[in-house]
Design a protein with these regions (language model features):
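Catalytic-core loop-and-flanking beta/alpha module that positions acidic residues
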Residues: 1-177
Length: 177
């Protein structure tokens, strides 16, 4: 029962911050990926997006775990990750989900952030403007396509730059195609 319920859940994760060095490092291919910015109020209202609970206590599943217990487990994370300021959408397998696990008719992002090391990647690929995943050695997104899609959907695009005197990122707007 519990395993069937767990396997029927889809989880999407979001953060309140877009300028965290650790998160760009481990979630965005060491600053070479992208970050999509959404309106949190819209996610809460439309999808019941909920804040992650950070705790030093582990919640265990039991065979007879209730949906409430499973949801609490799904929304709980070690307090060592509190810097992520994470929110999650938890959806039970339903008509809003496509077969690939993608939410149908999901809201558009408000902005797109291109990793600050993306220019290095473009240069490494002989100016073939593809976002590149070195670990898997595969191209997974065409930068020009992303920029064109953003322009067509009136989405702002930024490339954070690292300041010279501090460990901080500042957003720099990119001109679209």
């Amino acid at each position: 029962k519990t395993e069937a319920l767990r396997s029927s859940l889809f989880v999407a994760c979001f953060s309140e911050v877009n300028n965290s060095f650790p998160m760009w490092g481990y979630y965005a291919a060491d600053h070479k990926g992208i970050c999509l910015g959404y309106n949190l109020y819209e996610l809460v209202k439309k999808y019941k997006c909920m804040p992650v609970i950070y705790s030093d206590k582990l919640i265990f599943y039991r065979e007879d775990s209730s949906e409430k217990n499973i949801l609490a487990n799904t929304l709980t994370k070690s307090d060592e990750w509190i810097h992520e300021k994470e929110w999650r959408i938890v959806i039970k397998d339903d008509i809003n989900m496509g077969k690939s696990g993608i939410i149908k008719d999901f809201v558009l992002p408000r902005e797109i952030y291109i990793g600050c090391r993306q220019q290095e990647t473009v240069a490494e690929n002989n100016n073939n403007r593809m976002l590149h995943n070195k670990k898997e050695n595969e191209m997974y997104a065409d930068l020009d396509e992303i920029l064109k899609w953003a322009e067509n959907n009136y989405i702002d695009v930024y490339m954070p730059i690292i300041t010279r005197k501090e460990y901080k990122m500042m957003d720099r707007a990119l001109r679209l195609i």
